Amino acid sequence: MKEISLSVSRSRLYGEVARTAAYLGVKQAPADQPGEHFDRLTVIDGDKVLLDRLSNEAALALVEHIKSCVAAIDLGEEVITVSLSLSDAYDSCLTVSVTGNFEAYMAAFVTARWLRLTLPAKEEVWMAESRRFLNEIASALYHRNPPRRHT
């Protein structure tokens, strides 16, 4: 069995969500009230407890989707880690892609849940994006190298 570990720093994840929310706040603001959406969408330090809950939901949704591969999950204070146990036929070259998609999935899922509270019109777009990343992760994990004849 091949073992890989997917990790994301909560502070890095929350920074990405904050940047995305701020960007959406600026872009969605009406011309006559430029700060209204920005103030409503901005992530502040007081939102950490909510973001912790949303990021835990994201990790647990991932685990549910790929449960046949999951060896362990750690919802730590600073880092979320999902340990996977994969078939020996798993192509290790895909690990970089899986890791990148994991980080993107976590950010998209938390952003979607954040937007559900602050800008519901954009939530489904971000949830669809998180599902796309989730499907790419599953596709890479379940991809197998074709058998090779030893010569």
PLM feature segments, named:
Residues 95-104:
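Structural motif
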Residues 119-128:
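Short conserved catalytic/interaction loops centered on acidic-Pro-aromatic/His motifs
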Residues 1-87, 91-93, 129-131, 136-151:
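Conserved short "hinge" loops at termini or chain/domain junctions
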Residues 3, 99, 112-114, 131:
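Generic N-terminal initiation segments characterized by hydrophobic and/or small/turn-forming residues
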Residues 104-116:
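Short, hydrophobic/amphipathic alpha-helical patches that form generic packing surfaces
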